[in-house]
């Protein structure tokens, strides 16, 4: 397979389980769609990572020519909705509204500060002399911690959700290496990373997966005042 279309096919592959779950579990559709619509715009951050983190051949060579690409939007849409509902699918729980009296608790005074934490964290860290994947990982970890501090009831969902998404994402990395052998070596800027791989998977990809899963596992409930 030509490397030109690998990123498109791999990002689109995330839409398959998304679609199956969306159709099969109507009770989780709102959370999935909400999360995916919020994560999709993060695909526009691709110029921050090309070529510092990786240089994926893309449709019309957009990534290499402009930093932007269509595939990143597809990718961000596909992973957001799944990360938001994996824990709920495992536990067979559906989020319900938080009672009004609970919203008045002292911890919830920091509701919006907690939600803003990863974005506030990322900006100053981005300007440090390191690869942009690292401030992304730290920012999501801070966001996950802030979610738990503000909403302690989300601690299990955050932790288990992160592990579930790590496993899910690792399976997609396996599929990527199987369908396009050597693609990770050719496309990721491995010389600019830690050099630590788990099998063929860069440690940074796995750290991205677990922190992304931890943060987005609880954002829907936190932002919309719901709980499982």
Task: Describe the role of every protein-language-model region.
Residues 1-3, 61-78, 191-207:
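Short aromatic-rich membrane-water interface segments that cap or initiate transmembrane helices
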Residues 1-2, 123-133, 151-152:
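Membrane-interface helix caps and helix-loop-helix hairpins in membrane proteins
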Residues 10-19, 73-89, 139-145, 204-220:
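Hydrophobic cores of alpha-helical transmembrane segments in multi-pass inner/ER membrane proteins
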Residues 22-34, 96-103, 149-159:
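Membrane-interface helix-boundary motifs at transmembrane edges
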Residues 34-42, 159-174:
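Hydrophobic alpha-helical membrane-insertion segments
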Residues 37-57:
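A generic, lipid-embedded transmembrane alpha helix
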Residues 41-44, 139-150, 168:
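Alpha-helical transmembrane segments and their membrane-interface exit regions
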Residues 93-112, 227-228:
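Membrane-interfacial, low-structure loops and terminal tails that flank and connect transmembrane helices
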